[in-house]
């Protein structure tokens, strides 16, 4: 790929990608680009690691495309960018996929298969998917350090997590304790609250009576989890709430005394099917506090500590609202709020449910049953004990495991925690030092999450993860200060009773499980848990730098300059990094955050592979190419909003790249014919030899295009710096399509067609070379394939080997001409209006017109035409332009009036018809209602005619053969009138240009070289038209490269209908 080599006629994305991939490999393009900035100012980008649990979907494709684009942009801005890709290779996302492959349904299957064998399967699965993911990312042009990714399974990375956790422990923020946690009974492990995914399900909805001990009646509670009632310890009320004692009567005359929140009485009685009731007494919630009751299933679950002090009484609960019954069944062994309030009250924690969701022996009658399966038995037992007031069902949102989709349960277990709540103020202060795009994501969504974040449960009862590096002594008391937390492999080797090689030790289970440590005669063994997988990625900002094993890069680069992920990471990676950075290092590990949205289907539905609702990236690449797909993804705002994929917009991107391709191809053959010595500036690795814009005698339109380019460069750079690359793309594409393709190329086409080299052609060549080079650079982060190919043709052997080594284009103030830009904006608006007027008149642009009249509404129109009227005349193919100054009237215009009889009738009564007829005949030279009234009065012989603007609508009447159209810009307005009256001179040139167009088509059909000369015979079957054509023989021969018009012996012959006249044209190559 060099110089003026062959350029395919059409933009073919697949062909371009194939050639560019080969080229990149041949010249080590990525490696050269990295080395080129090796000594520059650093920019530390940290890649949020995707799970290696499947192929790249549209969401990860959008994410990686954004990252790649911003990395390329920063490199072009002169930075040495850290671009190490990362992969999250531990945790449930991997384990559940492996379980599916092996047909496992529970932990028991894993135990039977063998823990070590299962871990090896997980490792193999993660490695295989890493290769697939990496291949996916490379397929759409992502450049990262693919040979050196950070992997959460590597010993150096796992050590980074161990070290951070040991720092957290040294800071006094590690605790072993009981908490109510979300538990997946299938995976048999705790999961973080932010990992819980909610689905609508149908569950029991029961109202239960808890009989009071020392007074008549029952407390009425409501729950959707009957399976938690065996663990009930207290009932919570709102101490400030209003409650009522109600005597309710059933249809058969029996009565029940119930205690319910005042606002809930009617609903509770309706649910219970009561026919009548009376309010016995009003109570405040504080009145009820201290009342004791008998749990309805006490005999079925004898292990429930009914005799413990304070159990089975009424207490205040901050979370209680006047909803359902206004009294809340509370089981500290299950619910999070229940557990916290129970701890405050020093109540026992009774949890008769195991990690698998099955009742333990403490569950009494229900022992061995899965909790949700036990609901029916519990409901039946409540009914048998006359404790059931009403049993219904409800559809509601319920939490499920994020990986296996099993409904979660809340149970209390012993876990390891980082006590984030102890450093909440530091978390919020550190958060405020980071800059977010959009800002509201930090100040609203993220702040809310951080403010309400509980202590971080970092332990998981699984296999494939980073083992928790805690060794506990024999007969451990549970005090976190008495444990050993190992921070590095070297430390492990020094402390271990066994021989451990720090360079080769595998830190995974079960290797580390067998390692013991003895200190002062006491043996320590490792706890069996692995880390929450979010802790893995929380250390990415130093793990990617191989810290603490290597310190230099950390000291130079940390914290990260930029991270970017989707908005779900406010509860995920953004949060875990802030939490770990603050707890371990006292600082936030990133300075700037770009938060984008989700990738959705075209109709706005969320994509889901499991539901078959998805658009795969390879589908899009096969249909339209990688560059168009990237450009669409980068045309969407990256700041918080979700993206709905659009096939149409992706097709439009391919169309725009095809326009760029054609613009690029346009001057190449002319440049080659003239041996144009193209200039390559130093910013592109060139030596500034050849003909540049500084050496050329630029014409007005060249200066205009270069000025517009400066405007676009300034806007694009500002948008990139504001993380609005979509707006930068809009600006560049508008320039390519509107300014470059639809205007400049059309204006300079005839300059390119001139036979001999000239200063005018040279200026156009130099302008196109510079503009195309900089446009290619501006588009390089978006479309790395096509820009690479175009760049190589533009630079040949003079520039860098890859466009991605080039500097980002900077604004050249000397080329700015804002006044010229404003003038040309007026001319283009007038040209568009003139084209519309031509269409109205049915006159093609290739036919000249005798004159164009511009009725200017502002002086800026007059100024633009005075300075550059010849440019508009050329574009509208007119022999002359006449200008009507602002405030003046074109004396060839007239205005008639269209009457509104609904206004004339009431005003003129019986004379309205006569007035209307007079209005139809009246003509004035301006939209002057008084002048119109004078004409009507004179026509009717009256002097009492008064008209208003509501009575008539002025209608402009142009002279015969004249059509007009208005235009308006931000600073100018006017009307363009085109006089399409024919005379022989106009006809002669019009027919001649019709001949030229058809000969050019024939040349193309014959595949003639652009500079090939021909013989041309023109036979016209109309004597008059033939004479008109003959008058412009020099124009025809010049435009078609015909030596002469004359008889052709053996040429390509075609018959044409030209404006109703038959012509036979015959072309023969010389």
From Swiss-Prot:
It comes from Halobacterium salinarum (strain ATCC 700922 / JCM 11081 / NRC-1) (Halobacterium halobium). PANTHER family: ISOLEUCINE--TRNA LIGASE, CYTOPLASMIC, SOLEUCYL-TRNA SYNTHETASE. This is Isoleucine--tRNA ligase. SUPFAM superfamilies: Anticodon-binding domain of a subclass of class I aminoacyl-tRNA synthetases, Nucleotidylyl transferase, ValRS/IleRS/LeuRS editing domain. A motif ('KMSKS' region) lies at residues 606-610. It holds the Pfam family tRNA-synt_1. IleRS has two distinct active sites: one for aminoacylation and one for editing. The misactivated valine is translocated from the active site to the editing site, which sterically excludes the correctly activated isoleucine. The single editing site contains two valyl binding pockets, one specific for each substrate (Val-AMP or Val-tRNA(Ile)). Monomer. Keywords: Aminoacyl-tRNA synthetase, ATP-binding, Cytoplasm, Ligase, Metal-binding, Nucleotide-binding, Protein biosynthesis, Zinc. It is an enzyme of class 6 (ligase). Catalyzes the attachment of isoleucine to tRNA(Ile). As IleRS can inadvertently accommodate and process structurally similar amino acids such as valine, to avoid such errors it has two additional distinct tRNA(Ile)-dependent editing activities. One activity is designated as 'pretransfer' editing and involves the hydrolysis of activated Val-AMP. The other activity is designated 'posttransfer' editing and involves deacylation of mischarged Val-tRNA(Ile). It comes from the Archaea. GO terms for molecular function: aminoacyl-tRNA deacylase activity; ATP binding; isoleucine-tRNA ligase activity; tRNA binding; zinc ion binding. InterPro entries: aa-tRNA-synth_Ia (IPR002300), Anticodon_Ile_ABEc (IPR033709), Ile-tRNA-ligase (IPR002301), Ile-tRNA-ligase_type2 (IPR023586), M/V/L/I-tRNA-synth_anticd-bd (IPR013155), Rossmann-like_a/b/a_fold (IPR014729), tRNAsynth_Ia_anticodon-bd (IPR009080), Val/Leu/Ile-tRNA-synth_edit (IPR009008). One of its GO terms (biological process) is isoleucyl-tRNA aminoacylation. Its EC number is 6.1.1.5.
């Amino acid at each position: 790929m060099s110089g003026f080599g062959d350029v395919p006629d059409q933009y073919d994305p697949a062909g371009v990608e194939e050639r560019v991939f080969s080229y990149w490999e041949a010249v080590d393009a990525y490696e050269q680009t990295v080395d080129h900035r090796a000594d520059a100012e650093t920019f530390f980008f940290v890649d949020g690691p995707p799970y290696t649990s499947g192929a790249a979907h549209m969401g990860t494709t959008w994410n990686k495309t954004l990252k790649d684009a911003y990395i390329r942009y920063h490199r072009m801005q002169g930075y040495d960018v850290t671009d190490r890709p990362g992969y999250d290779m531990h945790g449930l996302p991997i384990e559940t996929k492996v379980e599916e492959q092996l047909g496992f349904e529970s932990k028991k299957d894993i135990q039977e298969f063998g823990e070590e064998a299962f871990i090896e399967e997980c490792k193999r699965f993660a490695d295989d998917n890493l290769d697939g993911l990496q291949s996916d990312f490379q397929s759409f042009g992502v450049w990262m350090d693919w040979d050196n990714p950070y992997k959460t399974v590597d010993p150096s990375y796992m050590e980074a997590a161990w070290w951070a956790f040991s720092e957290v422990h040294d800071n006094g923020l590690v605790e072993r304790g009981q908490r109510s946690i979300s538990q997946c009974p299938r995976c048999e492990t705790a999961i973080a609250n932010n990992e819980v995914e909610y689905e609508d399900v149908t569950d029991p909805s029961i109202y239960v009576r808890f009989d009071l001990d020392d007074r008549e009646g029952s407390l009425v509670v409501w729950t959707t989890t009957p399976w938690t009632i065996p663990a009930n310890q207290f009932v919570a009320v709102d101490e400030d709430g209003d409650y009522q004692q109600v005597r309710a009567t059933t249809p058969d005359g029996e009565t029940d005394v119930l205690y319910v929140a005042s606002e809930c009485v009617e609903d509770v009685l309706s649910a219970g099917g009561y026919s009548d009731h009376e309010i016995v007494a009003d109570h405040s919630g504080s009145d009820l506090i201290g009342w004791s009751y008998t749990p309805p299933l006490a005999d079925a679950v004898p292990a429930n500590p009914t005799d413990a002090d304070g159990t089975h009484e009424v207490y205040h609960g901050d979370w209680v609202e006047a909803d359902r019954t206004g009294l809340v069944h509370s089981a500290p062994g299950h619910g999070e709020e229940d557990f916290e309030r129970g701890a405050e009250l020093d109540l026992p924690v009774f949890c008769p449910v195991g990690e698998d969701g099955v009742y333990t022996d403490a569950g009494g009658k229900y022992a061995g049953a899965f909790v949700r399966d036990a609901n029916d038995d519990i409901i039946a037992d409540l009914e048998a004990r006359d404790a059931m007031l009403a049993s219904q069902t409800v559809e509601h949102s319920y939490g499920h495991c994020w990986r296996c989709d099993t409904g979660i349960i809340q149970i209390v277990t012993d876990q390891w925690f980082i006590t984030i709540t102890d450093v909440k103020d530091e978390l919020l202060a550190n958060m405020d030092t980071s800059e977010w795009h959009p800002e509201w994501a930090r100040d609203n969504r993220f702040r809310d999450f951080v403010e309400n974040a509980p202590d971080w449960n970092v332990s998981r009862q699984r296999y494939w993860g980073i083992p928790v590096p805690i060794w506990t002594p024999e007969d451990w008391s549970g005090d976190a200060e008495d444990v050993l937390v190992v921070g590095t492999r070297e430390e492990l080797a020094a402390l271990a009773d066994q021989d451990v090689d720090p360079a080769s030790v595998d830190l995974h289970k079960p290797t580390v499980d067998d390692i013991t440590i003895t200190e002062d005669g006491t043996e320590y063994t490792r706890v069996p848990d692995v880390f929450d997988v979010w802790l893995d990625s929380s250390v990415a900002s130093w793990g990617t730098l191989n810290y603490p094993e290597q310190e230099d890069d950390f000291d130079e680069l940390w914290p990260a300059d930029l991270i970017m992920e989707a908005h779900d990471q406010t509860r995920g990676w953004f949060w875990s990094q802030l939490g770990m950075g603050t707890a371990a290092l006292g600082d936030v590990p990133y300075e700037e955050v770009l938060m984008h949205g989700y990738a959705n289907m075209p109709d706005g539905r969320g994509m889901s592979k499991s539901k078959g609702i998805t658009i795969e990236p390879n589908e899009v690449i096969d249909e339209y190419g990688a560059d168009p797909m990237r450009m669409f993804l980068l045309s969407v705002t990256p700041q918080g909003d979700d993206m709905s994929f659009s096939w149409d917009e992706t097709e439009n991107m391919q169309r725009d790249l095809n326009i760029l391709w054609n613009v690029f191809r346009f001057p190449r053959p002319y440049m080659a014919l003239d041996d144009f010595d193209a200039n390559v500036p130093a910013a592109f690795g060139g030596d500034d030899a050849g003909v540049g814009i500084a050496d050329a005698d630029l014409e007005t339109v060249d200066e205009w295009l270069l000025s517009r380019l400066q405007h676009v460069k300034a806007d694009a750079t500002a948008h990139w710096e504001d993380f609005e690359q979509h707006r930068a793309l809009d600006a560049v594409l508008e320039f390519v399509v509107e300014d470059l393709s639809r205007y400049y190329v059309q204006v300079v086409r005839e300059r390119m067609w001139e036979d001999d080299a000239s200063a005018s052609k040279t200026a156009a060549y130099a302008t196109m070379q510079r503009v195309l080079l900089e446009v290619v650079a501006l588009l390089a982060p978006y479309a790395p394939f096509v820009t690479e190919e175009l760049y190589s043709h533009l630079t040949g052997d003079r520039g860098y080997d890859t466009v991605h080594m080039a500097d980002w284009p900077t604004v050249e103030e000397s080329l700015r001409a804002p006044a010229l830009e404003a003038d040309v904006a007026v001319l283009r608006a007038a040209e568009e209006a003139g084209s519309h007027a031509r269409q109205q008149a049915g006159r093609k642009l290739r036919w000249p017109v005798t004159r164009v009249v511009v009725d200017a509404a502002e002086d800026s129109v007059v100024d633009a035409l005075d300075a550059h009227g010849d440019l508009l005349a050329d574009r509208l193919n007119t022999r002359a332009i006449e200008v009507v100054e602002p405030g003046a009237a074109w004396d060839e215009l007239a205005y008639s009036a269209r009457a509104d009889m609904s206004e004339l009738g009431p005003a003129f009564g019986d004379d309205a018809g006569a007035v209307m007829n007079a209005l139809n005949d009246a003509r004035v030279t301006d939209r002057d209602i008084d002048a119109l009234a004078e004409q009507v009065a004179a026509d009717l012989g009256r002097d009492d005619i008064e008209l208003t603007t509501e009575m008539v609508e002025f209608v402009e009447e142009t002279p015969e053969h004249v059509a007009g159209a208005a235009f308006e810009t931000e600073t100018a307005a006017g009307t363009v009138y085109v006089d399409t009256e024919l005379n022989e001179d106009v006809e002669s040139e019009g027919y001649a240009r019709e001949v030229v167009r058809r000969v050019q088509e024939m040349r193309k059909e014959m595949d003639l070289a652009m500079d090939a000369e021909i013989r041309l015979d023109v036979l016209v079957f109309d004597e008059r038209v033939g004479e008109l054509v003959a008058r412009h023989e020099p124009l025809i021969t010049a435009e078609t490269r015909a030596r002469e018009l004359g008889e052709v012996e053996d040429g390509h012959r075609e018959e044409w209908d030209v404006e109703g006249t038959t012509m036979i044209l015959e072309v023969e190559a010389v």
